[in-house]
Amino acid sequence: TSGKAAKKAGKAQKSITKGDKKKRKESYSIYIYKVLKQVHPDTGISSKAMSIMNSFVNDIFERIAAEASRLAHYNKRSTITSREIQTAVRLLLPGELAKHAVSEGTKAVTKYTSSK
């Protein structure tokens, strides 16, 4: 290898050991995209729309978690089970949306339990 290449390689190595690694930003975007392709295979999504969807998923997640936590606390329980999650969903989501969410959730839990 030439001197320049060796210098570059050395620099790259140095920056890694210094801890200049890019911070990972977690998001639901790959899952949102997979669901989009299931319901509308020929539809795309802009990065701004994806960001909004990601915020929406995070918001709903936090609301359900907080409500489930409250329910567990009211009933002097220290564990959040699928029952608390289901009740939280019923309390947070309106009518038909809650029914569909509960049935999808039940389906997912059943699938997970049977695969174990």
UniProtKB/Swiss-Prot annotation:
Residues 1-11 have a biased composition (Basic residues). PROSITE patterns: HISTONE_H2B. InterPro entries: Histone-fold (IPR009072), Histone_H2A/H2B/H3 (IPR007125), Histone_H2B (IPR000558), HISTONE_H2B_site (IPR055333). Signal peptide: none annotated. Glycans are attached at residue 103. Keywords: Acetylation, Antibiotic, Antimicrobial, Chromosome, DNA-binding, Glycoprotein, Isopeptide bond, Nucleosome core, Nucleus, Ubl conjugation. Pfam families: Histone. GO terms for cellular component: nucleosome; nucleus. The keyword DNA-binding applies. It comes from the Eukaryota. Belongs to the histone H2B family. This is Histone H2B.
